Amino acid sequence: MEVAPEQPRWMAHPAVLNAQHPDSHHPGLAHNYMEPAQLLPPDEVDVFFNHLDSQGNPYYANPAHARARVSYSPAHARLTGGQMCRPHLLHSPGLPWLDGGKAALSAAAAHHHSPWTVSPFSKTPLHPSAAGAPGGPLSVYPGAAGGSGGGSGSSVASLTPTAAHSGSHLFGFPPTPPKEVSPDPSTTGAASPASPSAGGSVARGEDKDGVKYQVSLSESMKMEGGSPLRPGLAPMGTQPATHHPIPTYPSYVPASAHEYGSGLFHPGGFLGGPASSFTPKQRSKARSCSEGRECVNCGATATPLWRRDGTGHYLCNACGLYHKMNGQNRPLIKPKRRLSAARRAGTCCANCQTTTTTLWRRNANGDPVCNACGLYYKLHNVNRPLTMKKEGIQTRNRKMSSKSKKSKKGAECFEELSKCMQEKSSPFSAAALAGHMAPVGHLPPFSHSGHILPTPTPIHPSSSLSFGHPHPSSMVTAMG
């Protein structure tokens, strides 16, 4: 079978084909390799693979790990087909992490590692590797390497299962999928081998290639969950990524939550802490009292303000003001109270002849009049008629002063607010957020916290993905 010229995918490399002609010793793979003249320009290839090396390939602790990690996943292989050889990685002196004396590239690792899923919890791929064909070329799908068969000359060294397993625990960062080249399952389907033999049908290869392309997309989404950086955050409330095919971010609890107390991060304390903290500090009206301080004039020990006389002795506020205004000491004996105007003997109103009133006034002639007659004349310039006279003195309940009214209203408002906050949780609390998020099924879930960082939106939702209520203690009032 001949490959169409519009699919220049592969080139023959002597290190992979044991320096022999591909047609004579590898008849089953001859149609999968193209001449270098049909490949992409070297500049574009170098830029693309440098992009993968800078973002996708992790760094390793020893050369054995590096050897185990060179085989590439279907997600990257889809850009060039089913089988691929990278000569600039095989014989590049500028890569110190590869052993120069060994062609240390594994075609048969026990696990299939993808640079897009650098995770200690990554799954076993759908295409198992065949470690029994050391002479075959490098294969992106390890299962296809077993059918290559053939020579066993300077074969590529294969790793033991222990080394292959240890490759999954390497440190690395999940890469960003390359956007320069987008894989097309329809055009690259024929290049993927569907069976170990070379006579496999192209239609069958395209069918399997479509399945592999979908699998590579689903596996490439598992970028964040099982990174070795994530298990360090496990004590903060996250679960292992093995239970969730599509992982979520761990809960974020700032260190300042333990420093400033639970009031700032309590669900009911969004506005500043527990309900008791809403009450402002009222100015203490108790009189200041110091030990051993006494007014030298009246002997008082409690006063709103302590003053001093000319000699430096302490005076209470009343005695100090009196001394300041009058220049003499405040008399200790209160003066006799003057008789009230209502009790003046022989005084009666010149208009209504009443003898009881709250306040005596005088008319225009200077005669004493009661309070009612005096006000009436002052307002109407007419004497008050006798028909309006009443035996009793009508009094009224005076309204409270505005200051006391405001203070009482403020205290009542704060008490009501504190009661409401105790009975019901704050509308900005984590419980309320969970209530709003629960009926919305297509939104990403919160992972043990109502925290601000959103979780990645799942493309393929799984039944094992749990929508848990956020823990109220880790709610960050981020309105800040």
From Swiss-Prot:
Signal sequence interval, chain numbering: none
Spans annotated as Disordered: 166-208, 457-480
Zn finger (GATA-type) start-end: 295-319, 349-373
DNA-binding found in the keyword field: yes
Entry keywords, A to Z: Activator, DNA-binding, Isopeptide bond, Metal-binding, Methylation, Nucleus, Phagocytosis, Phosphoprotein, Repeat, Transcription, Transcription regulation, Ubl conjugation, Zinc, Zinc-finger
Gene3D superfamilies in alphabetical order: Erythroid Transcription Factor GATA-1, subunit A
Swiss-Prot/TrEMBL GO biological process terms: angiogenesis; brown fat cell differentiation; cell differentiation in hindbrain; cell fate commitment; cell fate determination; central nervous system neuron development; cochlea development; commitment of neuronal cell to specific neuron type in forebrain
Pfam families, A to Z: GATA
CDD domains: ZnF_GATA (cd00202)
InterPro entries per the UniProt record, alphabetical: TF_GATA-2/3 (IPR016374), Transcription_factor_GATA (IPR039355), Znf_GATA (IPR000679), Znf_NHR/GATA (IPR013088)
Keyword field contains Phosphoprotein: yes
Residue list for modification Phosphoserine: 73, 192
One Gene Ontology MF term: RNA polymerase II-specific DNA-binding transcription factor binding
Low complexity biased stretches: 183-201
PROSITE patterns: GATA_ZN_FINGER_1, GATA_ZN_FINGER_2
Cross-link (Glycyl lysine isopeptide (Lys-Gly) (interchain with G-Cter in SUMO2)): 389
GO cellular component, one term: nucleus
Modified residues (Asymmetric dimethylarginine): 86
PANTHER family cross-referenced by the UniProt entry: ENDOTHELIAL TRANSCRIPTION FACTOR GATA-2 (PTHR10071:SF149), TRANSCRIPTION FACTOR GATA FAMILY MEMBER (PTHR10071)
Assembly with partners or alone: Interacts with BRD3. Interacts with AR and CCAR1. Interacts with MDFIC.
Function: Transcriptional activator which regulates endothelin-1 gene expression in endothelial cells. Binds to the consensus sequence 5'-AGATAG-3'. Plays an important role in the regulation of phagocytosis in alveolar macrophages, particularly during P.carinii infection.
Protein name: Endothelial transcription factor GATA-2
